[in-house]
């Protein structure tokens, strides 16, 4: 039987934040769109990770799971045994894509994957769950909070977000925009994310396009293309001048 703690790679005493971090990492790793050559296994892993997160991120479900295992969530302990469970008629897991979209709040998750954490390279710390965790930049990061999530009733989705922030004392200005759209089967999924930072007068723009399993990353400095990467492989550039 699958152990949800093992699925997420966390200890049984893991905190709620540990559970979120583990889900975020594994959901991005095993998303079927990122594994076009191994889609069957990816879909299975992606579903397991979503189920584990659904249970372990909810205190009540996690308590029942810790005491009775998955059978407790199914509403029975087997062998005619009986225990007090709020899921006596069985707990129904949601579509893993719905869990995924809700977790990322409608934002483009793959742009977050590219930067590991939004603007971590710029500011050196992570965004809190409501955007107010980081000192001095809470109002900037809070721009990301409250973005509408997408429910399972929609057969397709089209999402976008943008944000702008600056730190006067650091001489740095950052701007990020992202859009994602695709069908419910995610077969036509496409995401475009652009992140720009200005450091000491130099404008550095990173554009990332993911479409049907192919990733293209362009980095420009002051409008000049400096690097191009396709599916993780850097491409040779022909520049007229340096």
Swiss-Prot record:
What keywords sit in the KW lines? Answer: Chaperone, Cytoplasm, Methylation, Nucleus
Q: In which tissues is it expressed?
A: Expressed in all tissues examined with highest expression in brain and retina and lower levels observed in testis, spleen, heart, liver and kidney.
Residues of the region (Interaction with KRT18) are 119-242
User: Which GO CC terms are listed, alphabetically?
Assistant: cytoplasm; nucleus; perinuclear region of cytoplasm; Z disc
Q: Which residues cross the membrane?
A: none
Region annotated Interaction with HSP70 sits at 2-146
Question: Where does this chain mainly localize?
Answer: cytoplasm
Spell out the subcellular localization from the entry.
Cytoplasm, Perinuclear region; Nucleus; Cytoplasm, Myofibril, Sarcomere, Z line
Oligomer status and interactors: Homooligomer. Interacts with BAG3, HSPB8 and STUB1. Interacts with ALKBH1. Interacts with HSP70, KRT18 and PTTG.
The name of this protein is: DnaJ homolog subfamily B member 6
Phylogenetic placement of the source organism: Eukaryota, Metazoa, Chordata, Craniata, Vertebrata
């Amino acid at each position: 039987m699958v152990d949800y703690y093992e699925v997420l790679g966390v200890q049984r005493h893991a905190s709620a934040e540990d559970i979120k971090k583990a889900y975020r990492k594994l959901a991005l790793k095993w998303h079927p769109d990122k594994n076009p050559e191994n889609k069957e296994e990816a879909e299975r892993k992606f579903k397991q990770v979503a189920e584990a997160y659904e249970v372990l991120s909810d205190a009540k479900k996690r308590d029942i799971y810790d005491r009775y295992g998955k059978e407790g969530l199914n509403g029975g302990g087997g062998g005619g045994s009986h225990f007090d469970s709020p899921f006596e008629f069985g707990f129904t897991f949601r579509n893993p894509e719905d869990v995924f979209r809700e977790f990322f709040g409608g934002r483009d998750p793959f742009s977050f994957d590219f930067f590991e954490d939004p603007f971590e390279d710029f500011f050196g710390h992570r965004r809190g769950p409501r955007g107010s965790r980081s000192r001095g930049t809470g109002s900037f990061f809070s721009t990301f909070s409250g973005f509408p999530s997408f429910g399972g009733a929609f057969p397709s989705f089209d999402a976008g977000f943008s944000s702008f922030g600056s730190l006067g004392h650091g001489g740095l200005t950052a701007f990020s925009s992202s859009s994602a759209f695709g069908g419910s089967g995610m077969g036509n999924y496409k995401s475009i994310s652009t992140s720009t930072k200005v450091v000491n007068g130099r404008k550095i723009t990173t554009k990332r396009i993911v479409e049907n399993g192919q990733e293209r990353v362009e980095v420009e400095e002051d409008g000049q293309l400096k690097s191009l990467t396709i599916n993780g492989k850097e491409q040779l550039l022909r520049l007229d001048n340096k």
